[in-house]
Amino acid sequence: TSERLEIGGHPLVTGVDKPTRKEALDYYRKVVHNEKLNVKTFHEVTNIKRLAVGFETTAQTDKGQSVTLKSRFVALATGYFDNPKYLGIPGEDLPNVSHYFTEAHPYYERNVTIIGAGSSAADAALDLFKAGANVTMVHRGDSFRFSLKYWIKPNLENRVKEGSIKVHFNSVTKEITSDAVIIEKRLEDGTPETIIIPTDQTFALTGYYASTKLLEGVGVVIKSEDFSAQLNEDTFETNVGGFFVIGSAGYGTRTSDIFIENGLIHAEKAVKEVVRRLENTPVSA
């Protein structure tokens, strides 16, 4: 809801209970403007180096220039969408296959197959259906995930029930071609059946994971079981003093645990700790 997305005491006013992506982006841009925050867009951080005091962050601009910034603290909040979970099957690198969904309009009256059944896959399926695409979903499980957003799950299930969106449960994708997706479906008696789904475009929305490259580069301890960072969840500081990780960036493959709402709580705790140190005052009870 709007209230859960608000930051810095700035109200997010929308016409409906849940703001659209555009409304949220407009809101955050206005917060940056009103607070006069020093935001450097089109700067990709390539390295973070620990110094005797503080850190040195190196970034590459869209013009190919290298920029170096020094700071006493660093808070990493890069999310996890840079790293798709690849299927490792033939045809995954074809031009009609994508691990990211942007918009539905180009696929009007096209056959679209979505691999996956998480929130990203569910959102894409509904958007594509509304835009007039012929949508088929493929999921290895026997039902939609319980973790689906509560306002999306009933809508998706109703579209499947009425036949507007087709779904193959208990199915594993074996291969993607230029005009089809080949799956192996487990029938009720346990026997496998090969099914060929005519497809113009495939969206493999099977999840993402947070990169550990920058974390490991600065010396943050990474847990081997899920690639999450060692964090103090009272402050979201890592084992490296002065280095904080906010949101899903520190949770490796545990991305379903983190949302915008609780990521904002991480930020509040981290900023409170940074302010405390800058002011050199004890944390109030």
Roles of regions detected by a PLM:
Residues T1-I7, G88-G91, I246:
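Short, flexible, mixed-charge acidic loops at enzyme active sites
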Residues T1-Y27, S164:
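Glycine-rich active-site loop/strand segments that organize a redox cofactor
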Residues D26, N34-S71, K130-D226, P282-A285:
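A Rossmann-like FAD-binding core segment of flavoenzymes
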Residues K40, G79-Y80, S248-A249:
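Glycine-rich His-Gly loop
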Residues L76-A77, I114, A204-L205, V245:
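Redox-cofactor binding/interface segments in oxidoreductases and associated redox assembly factors
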Residues L76-E92, Y208-V220:
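Flavin (primarily FAD) binding-site architecture
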Residues Y100-R145, T191-I195, K213-L214, D234-V283:
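Rossmann-like dinucleotide/flavin-binding elements
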Residues F227-T235:
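Short glycine-rich, acidic/polar surface loops and turns
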